[in-house]
């Protein structure tokens, strides 16, 4: 219990830190809340002169000035309420924006391993759903606490000055209400955590159903996906019912205690009135203050529910923000890169996988050399290439560029020397030109066109409705597979980096396009260090060196003809591939 309180306070204190950056607006909001809150006991206080002076003593002056005073108080209350609502909305917007900006900045700087271990649906849910719930634990809770807290204190003070004995009866129920709030609040926080998990699972199913909609249709997976969605939606519904039940229990218990207090107070007030200790005006003031006290106390008691939900969401948000980013401690500048890559006893293992993906790799790639990595699926080709831009860090050994360890080179500078074209093309919902020039915003129109021509892409670009300014849809959904691949190649051509990684770069092209693009790639690879990952061995026969990988190790290396003559693993792969019947 004590550790939980400390953790909650630490989370809440961190949230307040975001708001303190706007302390002037926060102060104005607090002052307007205080003014609006104190108008309620002020109105209740006016009932005594109105009842005793106006109705009992028939004083005409009282009947005139009390209504005017009430109008003035409500004018002040309306202005203060407007200022409070506006500043609260502004502060809430700032809080949400800053959290989302920090989360997105973390998102784009997380290591590749994090994405391997976490579902995309949960990541999206954190940035959208969780951040919205954080505002409940941020400014919304402050608003209710300050506004209703001051109202409650004002009403309580008015009750004490009117009749302290009756006030003591009201205070008897408060410890019991607080105790019940704490018990139910703990339950609500646990249910809020579960709800976030269920919502993330439902978001994941939705995301996969949208991304894989063609596979779902072709393989008849509609019923399976509907069953998955029904399961997650049912979990969300059941959890929300539990939350509603716990919330209703909290509200019901609070209201029952308030009703008991009200009955007791009315009874004792009647006794005091019989003995002349309470005037009609006093009773109306006390009754109005007491009834006015219950509403803010009820809201304060229910604010614990919002706080528990918000704290659970804030815990998730801050855990994401605090995730360690990619290691980037390098300080060695590389003014000019020759492109010599060295793998020195490099090993790598994925988390929770028994066998290593790479074991003791020793490989030297000379400047301007084209090295092809071949092997069966799972042999470690893509993993080895992924170590070059430091998507992953080796478990043992080290990689060097021109004799400088990659870990000593700043990530931005290292990746500035690398161009990548992979089998899984990644495009943005933007224009053709913007996708080609991604990372080269300073590129001229002529450079973009030249890169597109070299990648054999201009022929289809010119046929698009708006040419280079055509928006291609999410991940290039409006283009064919071959067209998307050629845009990715054009992007690599435009970057003109000294290091190239081509991961099945021509796999999505038809035969005619493959020949043209292969010729463009061969021109690009001249005098550049290139790592080519290929399944079709026909595309890498002219490589300077072919490295054959098997179960995470280097099995063979050499030129195409020499490896065939050895009759080893490469020769068997070549024989197997070229003995397969060719598709029409």
Curated annotation (Swiss-Prot):
**Residues involved in ATP binding:** 375-382
Naturally occurring in which organism (per UniProt)? Chromobacterium violaceum (strain ATCC 12472 / DSM 30191 / JCM 1249 / CCUG 213 / NBRC 12614 / NCIMB 9131 / NCTC 9757 / MK)
Record remark: domains = In MsbA the ATP-binding domain (NBD) and the transmembrane domain (TMD) are fused.
The molecule here is called ATP-dependent lipid A-core flippase
Q: Which GO terms describe its cellular component?
A: plasma membrane
**Reaction catalysed by this chain?**
ATP + H2O + lipid A-core oligosaccharideSide 1 = ADP + phosphate + lipid A-core oligosaccharideSide 2
Identify the residues that the record assigns to the ABC transporter domain, covering every copy: 341-576
- Any idea which UniProt keywords this protein has? ATP-binding, Cell inner membrane, Cell membrane, Lipid transport, Membrane, Nucleotide-binding, Translocase, Transmembrane, Transmembrane helix, Transport
Return the similarity comment.
Belongs to the ABC transporter superfamily. Lipid exporter (TC 3.A.1.106) family.
């Amino acid at each position: 219990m004590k550790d939980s309180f400390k953790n909650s306070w630490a989370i809440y204190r961190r949230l307040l830190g975001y708001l303190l950056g706007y302390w002037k607006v926060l102060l104005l909001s607090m002052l307007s809340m205080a003014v609006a809150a104190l108008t309620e006991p002020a109105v209740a206080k006016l009932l005594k002169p109105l009842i005793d002076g106006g109705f009992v003593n028939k004083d005409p002056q009282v009947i005139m000035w009390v209504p005017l005073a009430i109008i003035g108080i409500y004018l002040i209350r309306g202005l203060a309420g407007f200022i409070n609502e506006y500043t609260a909305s502004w502060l809430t917007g700032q809080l949400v924006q800053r959290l989302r900006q920090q989360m997105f900045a973390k998102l784009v700087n997380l290591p590749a391993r994090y994405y391997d271990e976490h579902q995309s649906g949960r990541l999206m849910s954190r940035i959208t759903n969780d951040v919205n719930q954080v505002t409940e634990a941020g400014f919304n809770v402050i608003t209710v606490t300050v506004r209703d807290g001051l109202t409650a204190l004002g009403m309580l003070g008015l009750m004490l000055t009117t009749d302290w004995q009756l006030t003591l009866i009201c205070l008897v129920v408060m410890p019991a209400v607080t105790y019940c709030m704490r018990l139910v609040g703990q339950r609500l926080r646990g249910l809020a955590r579960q709800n976030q998990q269920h919502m993330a699972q439902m978001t994941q199913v939705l995301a996969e159903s949208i991304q894989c909609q063609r596979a779902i249709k072709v393989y008849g997976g509609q019923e399976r996906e509907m069953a998955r969605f029904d399961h997650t939606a049912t979990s969300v519904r059941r959890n929300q019912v539990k939350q509603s039940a716990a919330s209703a229990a909290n509200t019901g218990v609070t209201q029952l205690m308030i009703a008991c207090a009200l009955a007791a107070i009315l009874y004792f007030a009647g006794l005091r009135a019989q003995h002349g200790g309470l005037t009609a005006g006093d009773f109306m003031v006390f009754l109005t203050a007491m009834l006015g006290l219950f509403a803010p106390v009820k809201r304060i008691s229910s604010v614990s529910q919002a706080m528990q939900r918000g704290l659970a969401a804030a815990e998730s948000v801050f855990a994401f923000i605090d995730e360690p980013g990619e290691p980037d401690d390098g300080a060695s500048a590389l003014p000019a890169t020759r492109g010599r890559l060295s793998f020195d006893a490099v090993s790598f293992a994925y988390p929770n996988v028994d066998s290593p993906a790479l074991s003791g790799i020793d490989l030297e790639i000379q400047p301007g050399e084209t090295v092809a990595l071949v092997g069966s699926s799972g042999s470690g080709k893509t993993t080895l290439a992924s170590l070059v831009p430091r998507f992953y860090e080796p478990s043992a050994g080290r990689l060097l560029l021109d004799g400088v360890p990659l870990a000593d080179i700043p990530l931005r500078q290292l990746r500035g020397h690398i161009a990548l074209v992979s089998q899984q093309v990644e495009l943005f919902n933007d224009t053709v030109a913007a996708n080609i020039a991604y990372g080269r915003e300073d590129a001229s129109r002529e450079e973009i066109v030249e890169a597109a021509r070299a990648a054999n892409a201009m022929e289809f670009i010119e046929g698009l409705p708006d040419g280079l300014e055509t928006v291609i849809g999410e991940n290039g959904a409006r283009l064919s597979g071959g067209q998307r691949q050629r845009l990715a190649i054009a992007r690599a051509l435009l970057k003109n980096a000294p290091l190239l990684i081509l991961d099945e770069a021509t796999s999505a092209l038809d035969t005619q396009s493959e020949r043209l693009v292969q010729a463009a790639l061969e021109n690009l690879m001249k005098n550049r260090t290139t790592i080519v990952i290929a399944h079709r061995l026909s595309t890498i026969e002219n490589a300077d060196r072919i490295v054959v990988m098997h179960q995470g190790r280097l099995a063979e290396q050499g030129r195409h003809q020499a490896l065939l003559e050895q009759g080893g693993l490469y020769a068997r792969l070549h024989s197997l591939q070229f003995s397969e019947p060719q598709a029409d």
